[in-house]
Each structure stands twice: as C-alpha cells, then as structure tokens.
Amino acid sequence: MKIKKVLYSLLFLCSVIQSYAQDTIKLKPYIENMKTVDVFIEGKKYNFLFDTGGAETIISPEIAKIINKEIYGSTTGFRMSGEIIKAQKADSISFLIGKTKIFHQTVGVWNLMSILPKEFTKIDGVLSLKSFAQNIITIEISKNILIIENNVSAKKSIKGKSLLTTRFANGIEGSELNIFVGIPKINRIYWFLFDSGNSGPLLLSNESSEIWKIKKETQTDNFEKNPEAEFIIGKKNLKIKPFARDIIYDGVLNFDAISKYVFTIDFKNKEVWFE
C-alpha cells in the first residue's frame, strides 16, 4: 500500500513539474542586430534566421533535397518595399527547436542567401511566427531569449503585463502569420509591422512621416542624426529616431524598439502582452 502511495506521489510530482516546464531557446547573434536559432531537421542542425516579421517559415532548396521532400507549387509574398518574392513549397516537415518538436504542414522553399551579401554567414532558412501558431511564446530579444510556454507558465508570464492593440495577419494567400501593433496618433490608429529582423531604424511610410512630422529633408544616411519622435506603444511612450521610406505599411518596428520590452504572444487567442 505504501509503495502505491509513493508511486502516485511521484507521478503527481512529475506531472506538476511538467506542467510548469518551459522550453527556453537561446537566440544567437548574427549580422548587426539580427538573430539566428538552431533548428534540427531529421537529426541535422541548421542555422535559421529568427524573424518576427518573416511572415512564412522557409527552408532552403538544399534542405528540401537532403530530406527528400518534393518541392512544388508557387507562393507569393512581399517585402516591405513592395518587392514581390516568389517561392515554392514543401509539405510535412518537423522542426526540433530546443526540446520542442513543431510539425509544419507546409513551409516555404526559398534561398534566403539570394538577397543577402555574399560575405554573410550562411542561413539555411527562416523561423517565423507562423511556426508558433499553436503556441504561446515569450520574446525577450534584448537577452536573446525565446520561451515556448505552456498553459500554466503562460499565465505566470502574462501576469503584470499590459495587453497591446494588435492585428494578426495571414497574408494574401492565408498562409502567412505577421503581427501588426496599433499605434495611436491624432485620433487614428496606425499599424506597424512587428519586425525583429529590421536591424535598421524604425520605419515610417512617406504618408505616416507627414503625421509624425518627420521631414525627408531632415533625414541623413546616418539615421542616428535624425530627430526623435514619440510613439505610444500600449501604455509606454517610446522615443526613437525613425526613418521615412517608401514602404507598403504605415510603419515597421525595428529591433531597437522591440528590444526595449518583453512580449508574450498567445497565438490561439490572438493576444500580445508586454512590459
């Protein structure tokens, strides 16, 4: 009888430990402020760019061939400049990230190195927010930390944080996942792409720059010399030097802005909490 009680106690303890378990993934520095992450596919380690503004998770054609996946079809995305990106697809691929296995029904297949300078270290793919569509994650990018939460740890993580005004967007084909943060200005809401991969300045469209009174003639190639502007993010006032550019969004948050806060993203409930 005592043995049974001990076994039941051990099983209960294991379940409690598991319920509080988090998977903390360490991000690695790349060029400028960009981050990479180790992704294992069929036991082999690859170097993926972690990009919250990446829209689609992609693998290189080389990986698809190594794991004998058929490359097929066509998918279309847009860079913030409006440039069209054409890619293909592959199905049924599992990633191991930290201790977490994530199954992808479909991923994009495209060679990211085709748009990067030749001297950049090789990138094998892009890990976008789409990979976490069934999860709750916490991003503390200033400390190079990505946490995959469970239901219990997520409640603890959200505690003390404020809810952000956001939109979750799935792109023109319904196959992407991006987050836009609503930033108020003169009784209107402007929507900024949540883009950790933007290692440059916070960007304003030409139209938004007029609202924030950022004159093109005051800009220099060295944006650090540009004037500061104020952006209200949730209950926080962010003062940062933006740059006006011909882009397809109202604006694009950058690494510098995102690194000032800690974000917990609940994809199922489409909520973003931050502090």
Report residues per predicted region.
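Pepsin/retropepsin-fold aspartyl endopeptidases
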Residues: 20-275
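Bacterial Sec-dependent N-terminal signal peptides
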Residues: 1-24
